[in-house]
A protein has these predicted regions:
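ATP-binding N-terminal substructure of ATP-dependent carboxylate-amine bond-forming enzymes
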Residues: 1-113, 117, 139
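Short, basic and Ser/Thr-rich N-terminal targeting/leader segments
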Residues: 15, 128, 160-161, 194-198, ...
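Single conserved hydrophobic/aromatic residue that forms the stacking wall/gate
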Residues: 243-252
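Structural detector of well-ordered beta-strand residues that form the stable sheet scaffold
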Residues: 43, 82, 102-103, 130, ...
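Internal nucleotide-binding/catalytic subdomain
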Residues: 168-244
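A conserved helix-loop-beta module that forms one wall/lid of the active-site cleft
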Residues: 99, 105-166, 171
Length: 252
């Protein structure tokens, strides 16, 4: 029936319907602007009253991402819900998905917000990863192989724009860095002579059709993205690795 189609996401959500987005940042603002241009009503759930997306949405629910009353309002107002960044609690997406289509799914967001889970997911998918080790306990730290050094110690969660990352060359420096990071779960990645970092953005429809945008090359300064260039050259390898992850990554 129509309700089952809506929940499965197989029924089209036409302009005039209300779309919800969790998070009020710049990406959310871009989503809101484009949705409004297409004729949709927009709702943003974001605790910051002056957030970029909340300021331009039709409705701004100012509450925490795990506020039960706010989530009930989102479910009541919206035909479908998405998130504009990866650090929305996965249980929030899971709760909303019980009554409305949610994409990306909670399982995908849980992977994206944890570097250790992300590495394990890529390995299962057959995507080559830099040699690495997960460090969660002193025993894990002691078991790190010498051939992973020099490396970069990264917090498993919440690091961005160079934050939560420390370059280490020796075991002593590794131990000191883990202490400086408050001994939170971390991933140690071996430093490699990288030719470039690429981004592959793909979109998948409910019919399973997959389209990838032009591949981008990213240039960083001090661990922070500075320039992104679109390269039309030979990027088939990067695209193929991305497609390996899609069968087990619930994005639409």
């Amino acid at each position: 029936d129509a309700a089952a189609q809506a929940m499965s996401g197989s029924a089209p959500i036409l302009p005039g319907a209300t779309l919800g987005v969790l998070g009020g940042g710049q990406l959310g603002r871009m989503f809101v602007h484009e949705a409004q241009r297409m004729g949709y009503v927009t709702v943003v759930l974001e605790p910051d009253q002056s957030s970029p997306a909340g300021l331009v949405a039709h409705h701004h629910i100012r509450a925490a991402y795990d506020d039960e009353h706010a989530l009930a309002d989102m479910a009541r107002l919206c035909a479908a819900v998405t998130t504009e960044f990866e650090n929305v609690p996965a249980p929030t997406l899971q709760a909303l998905s019980r009554s409305k289509p949610v994409s990306p799914a909670a399982e995908a967001v849980a992977i994206a917000q944890d570097r250790a889970l992300e590495k394990a997911h890529f390995v299962r998918c057959g995507v080559p990863c830099a040699p690495h080790a997960v460090i969660e306990t002193p025993d894990h730290l002691a078991a790190v192989q010498d051939d992973l050094l020099p490396g970069i110690l990264k917090t498993a969660r919440l690091g961005y724009d160079g934050k939560g990352q420390v370059r280490v060359a020796t075991r002593e420096a590794l131990a000191q860095a883990w202490n400086e990071l408050k001994q939170v779960p971390c991933v140690l990645e071996k430093m490699l002579p990288l030719a470039a970092e690429c981004s592959v953005v793909v979109a998948r429809g409910q019919d399973g059709q997959i389209v990838n945008l032009p591949v981008q090359r990213n240039l960083h300064r001090e661990g922070i993205l500075a320039v992104t260039e679109v390269h039309p050259g030979n990027v088939s390898e990067a695209v193929s690795y991305t497609h390996l992850t899609l069968p087990t990554t619930p994005y639409v």
